[in-house]
Regions:
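N-terminal hydrophobic/helix-forming segments and targeting peptides
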Residues: 1-96
Length: 96
């Protein structure tokens, strides 16, 4: 994607807009990010494939969406809260 006449401030606004999208390799955050980028560059072609589809040596995984996650101390204090920083959770984590 080549976008001409774009300064650093505009790119920073895009990054700020996209920060909260919970992106992984699948899921609503990834689709929302791609749609956002398509609004910037209408020439972007977006393709989707069903989970389980074989692509070369890789099977497309099940969709993964996250809404909340955290580590909680026995006192009830929460740490590494996803709602405060979406980098606290690794994609495809599973609840314990």
């Amino acid at each position: 994607m080549i976008i001409r006449n774009t300064d650093g401030r505009q790119m920073l606004r895009w990054m700020e807009d996209l920060w909260d999208y919970p992106r992984s390799i699948t899921g609503h955050g990834t689709r929302s990010t791609l749609e956002y980028l398509k609004n910037i560059n209408p020439d972007l072609n977006i393709h989707s494939f069903k989970s389980g589809t074989r692509v070369f040596d890789w099977d497309i995984p099940d969709e993964w969406n996250i809404y909340d996650a955290y580590i909680e101390h026995e006192s009830g204090q929460k740490f590494a809260e996803f709602t405060k920083n979406n980098l606290h959770v690794l994609g495809y984590s599973i609840p314990c």
